[in-house]
Amino acid sequence: MGHKLSKITLAVLSLGTLGFAQHSLAQETETESEQDVEVIEVSGIRASLASALNEKRFQNNLVEVIEAEDIGKLPDQNLAEVLENITGIQITREAGVGTGVQIRGTDANRTEINGVSTVGSGTGRSGIDFEDVSASIIAGLEVTKSPDAKTIEGSVGGTINLKTIRPLQLTEQLLSFRVQGENSSLTTDSGLQPRFSGTYGDNWENDHGKFGVVISGSYAEQDVTAFRPRADRDNLIASDSGVASAQSFDFLPIQFFVQDYDNFEYETKNFVGSFEWAPNDDTRFFFDAVINDQERLQESSRVQASGVSALNDISVPDSYETINFGSLGGTDLGSIQAALTGVIPVNLDNDDDDPNLRLSSDTNSRVTESKIFRLGGEWTGDKWFVSAEVASSSSDTTTPSFNTTLNFINPNAPIDAGGANDNSVPFEYDLTGGSLAFGIASGADYAPTTAQLLDPYNVVLRDVNIGRDTTENFEDAFRTDFTYFLDTMITSVDFGYRYSKAGSKREDISSSVGLRTMEDSPRGDLFSELLVAGPDNFNDADGRDLYVKDFLIIDPELVASDPDGVLETLQAAMTEHGSTASISAPTSSSSGFFDIEEETHALYAQANFEYEMFRGNFGVRYLETEVTSVGNSITVDDEGNELVSQVTTTGDYDFVLPRVNIVADVADDVVLRFGAGKDIRRPDFDDLSTSVTFSTSPNPNVAIGNPNLTPEEVISYDLAAEWYFAEGSVVSVGIFHKTRKDLHVEQIVSPYEDPVTGYRDLTDPCEGGGIFNPIADINVFGPDLGTGICVGTETKVNDSGETTQKGIEFAVQYDLAGFEEELGWASGFGVLANYTIQEFSGGEAENSATSRASNVFAATTGDDDIEVSAVQGLLNLSENAYNVTVYYEKFGLSARMRYTWREAYRTDDFGSTSSFPWGFPAVQADRGQLNASVNYDVNENLNVGIEAVNITKSDVEQYCVNDGALLCFQGLTDRRITVG
């Protein structure tokens, strides 16, 4: 081969065992590489960390790397939890399981597998769901924070690329098998949940060339539980209101209570297969297949103290606490007293059916099948490197749900005189010590007994909501890449073309019935075979004494296994009871359908350079995208019949994305990096659709798409310094700055509520705000029973202002292996630590206080005309976060302990409501989590270990309005232990 590669280029090509095989280089080049550049083999924690560090060091852009053993010895069960180890990355969790990833404060990232785009189960753009990917099938991963022109567009924070084992790089036959069992501290199921994973790989050579194959698979079950108590105190009893409960001061009464028991049962199957063939030293062909099946069954329950607000005028708290709201939008919101402990009694003279006890069974499950296929080849000549591949990613998801609600009919209190299917139950509450605790006031008048609470005759059917929505996502792509090598300061020129076609299709398949009268609601003895006692261990997490222990729900396990049978039984009960309503099987909703496709053509050109201590690349990426959206237009004729017609809209856009990366090796052990580039973030598919889906509840907002939503534009700058002061050790500091234009933000419009009665508009159109929901229950928001009410709306819009994200990242990795003579056994220790400080500023899109919240703020500020609003900012961004890992590896023992902490951040994940409480995203308080693992090599072929997640059972606290203001939600999570 005439072209001669530089040592730096050779280092990049020879890194580790996880990259693509570079067998296509000529023997002369391979020999030089082997002589001049150290190749680090992955074997054990220490070696894998060193290998990952070496790979990062010789990259021409800013990339973070984790490799095989590094992943395998962490107590991480899915992709999100693996990524939490990287500087600048935080994760969000659902019931303790990592489900979301923020890179440099943003969720707007991309996920690839072997460089192929992935698609998720929903309608987002970030790729495959993080909880769907088992850590056991990942051989390594890269997070590109500063892209080059080759990098596919679409990420704001970074691009995550998962790597699988390359067959032709195996130096010997690979065979491994792992068996584990996991236990959750809060689950009611006994025993261990199984986890199995295995890998086989080998390569061989004959007259037709060299062949290699790797097959990996995993099967895992997981049972995770979290308790999420909720207390609403978003109303006002003014001192001058004249009601019986009024005090000499204004205070916040109790509005609503929820005892939310979340349980998710995961069954995850992953398969990865790779085949490679190299007919000669210059040519390689490959085929990859990644198949994932994820089944997440929800078996959750909710106990609700509803109608509590009806007693606000007479219920006097026993004690109060002072709530300081802080400031929003530059306005000091002052402070107020809030109910802390007390009893909400039954007062038949005031209200003959409130407060009441409502019992729900939630089974919002997800079944997803994801497939990724990749076929391609590459050829290396004297001056050229050419590669081409076709790839297909798909994800088909069904979200089966069968949610039911029962009302408890208290036999010690009279039936509602108006015929409603609920009646009064007394409650008590104690919110001291940061515990949102409530339960039945057992010593109060009309209190039911345990036997009465568990008697099927004392519950009636209230709601049935069935859904079987489907989402089909795909991306098919073809790309070809060329490299021309030069013997100048410009070492090579890369250029290429990529075509992709992506789409998302959704069908809203549902049915529902709401029963509001005793005349229509069958009692539980008519469907008693469906009823079970709800979980009675709500005190296991924090030892609380006050909670609702005894109640009945429709068996969520039976619903999951036989939904049609449950539906048939409920309909038979309604028929026997003589109900005027009926339950139908789920059908497709015309208003909830959309089918969106986009085609993209992308070209790039990039020059790679190396001169003395400088190296890097500069280039440009150009793309054109055309979007076609199909939805339904629904009108009503003169006779009231629904007329459905399909409407197709098209749009297009193009962008030029320049990118540059410069690396300076200023000393043998010091590297400086600079990166600058432009990228875009496309809107989520459902944010473009004008299709709408209504809920039978008056509380959730209705999501309305925005077909005029345009991609975000982001310009990023990176500056970093890395000091490799010892073998396998580094200290680094980096600065990043991102300017975002047309940020996608949530615009929420809340319906008007009368400050005295709390009633909403019950007729269409909703002049005071929101949208008319024809099937929503009026509930406490109107004077009479029925359906049809104004509810809130939420729509994604482009922020008209420019926003900025900037921050500093610090990291240190230190290994004591070099001090074995001085330290002996203690030389097995090592430490990794990172710290990120970041901030978000700018933007003009604002959230505004709800009408009830405005009444409270008028009282706390003395300004009756106050209008409180604040820039929404960026959700899920913690300004400060750190991660510390201490490990030990010696004498066959491999142990790690990792503590992760992140500062408070605003979130839209706040349990049993989808509306912004008080009109603003909730604030999730500071939280840390401790994980650990210990493994021991019994011999060369057998390893045993134990892993622990959330050892200290760290709780989640969420506040309304501001951090530390009004505690609204809790998340009491489990500890999970895995052995094997």
Model-predicted regions and their roles:
Residues 41-72, 116-121:
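N-terminal periplasmic "start-of-domain" segments of outer-membrane beta-barrel proteins
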Residues 80-118, 145:
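Extracytoplasmic beta-strand/coil segments of soluble accessory domains associated
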Residues 118-145, 198:
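Short acidic/polar hinge/loop motifs at secondary-structure boundaries
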Residues 151, 167-173, 205-211, 282, ...:
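Short loop/turn motifs that connect adjacent beta-strands in outer-membrane beta-barrel proteins
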Residues 517, 739-741, 900-913, 935-980:
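C-terminal beta-signal and adjacent terminal beta-strands/loops
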